[in-house]
Structure formats: C-alpha cells, structure tokens
Curated annotation (Swiss-Prot):
GO terms for molecular function: mRNA binding; rRNA binding; structural constituent of ribosome. This is Small ribosomal subunit protein uS3. Keywords: Ribonucleoprotein, Ribosomal protein, RNA-binding, rRNA-binding. Residues 39-108 form the KH type-2 domain. SUPFAM superfamilies: Prokaryotic type KH domain (KH-domain type II), Ribosomal protein S3 C-terminal domain. Part of the 30S ribosomal subunit. Forms a tight complex with proteins S10 and S14. It comes from Caldicellulosiruptor saccharolyticus (strain ATCC 43494 / DSM 8903 / Tp8T 6331). Belongs to the universal ribosomal protein uS3 family. Gene3D superfamilies: 3.30.300.20, Ribosomal protein S3, C-terminal domain.
Length: 222
C-alpha cells in the first residue's frame, strides 16, 4: 500500500495536518468545499510564478483566513502591499463578499519542498531541457540542502517518443510505510508540444518524533 496511497493522506492526523480546517453541516459542506477549490485555483493561476506550494484555509462564521506558503513572498505581497490587497478583493468577490484575511508565509528552503521541485522540473521540460538532466539536477540540489532521500518520476511522451513511458530516479531512503517519516509529495504537469508529461516528487526529510514521548523523557531526566 505504501506505493499506492498519497503520502500526505496516509499521515493525516499523525504527523500531517489538513489544508482545509473547518466544520460544516451537510447543507453547507458542498458550498464550502467548492469555495476552497475556487480560492486555490484562482491563487495558483494568478501567482503561478510566485512558487506557491500550499494554500491553507481556515473558516470562522463569515471570515476566511487564507495562508499562502510561497518561495517568493515579494511577488505575492507586491509593492507596498498592493498585490495582497488586490488578491484579497478578488477572493472576496469569489466567495460572495465574505471577509478574507491573507497570511503570507515564506518557504525558507524551496529545494526541500516537493511541490516546488515538481513544478521546477515541469517548467524545465516545457523549455525542452532533457528530462534526465532536469531530474538529476533537482535531486542533487535537494540532497545538498539536507534531504535524506528523494525520488522523482516522469510519465508521458518523454523526448517526443511515439510511445509514452515512465522513468524514475531515486537517491537515499524513501520509507513510505513508516508513518513517523516526514515525506513531502508533489505533483505537476508539463504542457509540451507532444502532450502532457506528469511529474511526481517524493522528498524524505527525516523522522518526526511524538511530542508526548519527548516531554516524558525530559521529565525522567530531571
């Protein structure tokens, strides 16, 4: 199952948290879910070059808090905050006038973010860079930045071949079955003249130890 299930979904509630954090009754659930989808799609389309990895959404009554994780906060914020203000007004229009608050968080090491790595490989494939070169360079950067393991996979008409195929490379460890293993996963698509090429990335950053156990050990040391 470790090869089939989404690495983040497999770890939700254990070491990973939900990207949408709110509760709704049966009547409102569908509406809120569609709103979340529209918010994420609009932000990704408008700020595709800003290196946005994750968009978290929290709700309270008529207020929505949107947390944007980006490698280039300057592009999102804009000059004197004009970019954030324009984005906030657009999102309020999408959600039917609900109060939107935006929180921009910088990704300190984009080389260790699986989504950004996948998007970077996809962007290079669109520029006709060799898929092997793009994958190996991305893996080398991740390992230099402190990753304990990385796996990249591309699927499609690689190099313009008549028959689609899948190729992958792996360096280090990727313990998919270990729930405490902090594995980041990303997916992107490259739109080439030959069709779409799917890019998947797994990055292993180390184990996340439970906080309760750590607290108990400290108490025992005293």
């Amino acid at each position: 199952m470790g090869q089939k299930v989404h690495p983040k979904g497999f770890r939700l509630g254990i070491i990973k948290d939900w990207d949408s954090r709110w509760f709704a009754n049966d009547k409102d659930f569908e509406k809120y879910l569609l709103e979340d989808y529209k918010i994420r799609r609009h932000i990704k389309e408008k700020l595709y070059n800003a290196g946005i990895s994750r968009i978290e959404i929290e709700r309270a009554a008529k207020r929505i808090k949107v947390i944007i994780h980006t490698a280039k906060p300057g592009i999102v914020i804009g000059r004197a905050g004009s970019g954030v203000e324009a984005l906030r007004k657009e999102l309020e229009k999408i959600t039917g006038g609900k109060t939107i608050s935006l929180d921009i968080k910088e990704i300190k090491v984009p080389e260790l973010d699986a989504q950004l790595v996948a998007e970077n490989i996809a962007a290079q494939l669109e520029k006709r860079v060799s898929f092997r070169k793009a994958m190996k360079q991305a893996m080398a950067r991740a390992l230099r930045s402190g990753a304990k393991g990385i796996k990249t996979m591309v699927s499609g008409r690689l190099g313009g071949a008549d028959i689609a195929r899948t190729e992958w490379y792996k360096e280090g460890r990727i313990p998919l079955q270990t729930l405490r293993a902090d594995i980041d996963y990303g997916f992107a698509e490259a739109h080439t003249t030959y069709g779409r090429i799917g890019v998947k990335t797994w990055i292993y950053k180390g184990d996340v130890l439970p906080q309760k156990g750590a607290a108990a050990e400290k108490g025992g040391d005293k």
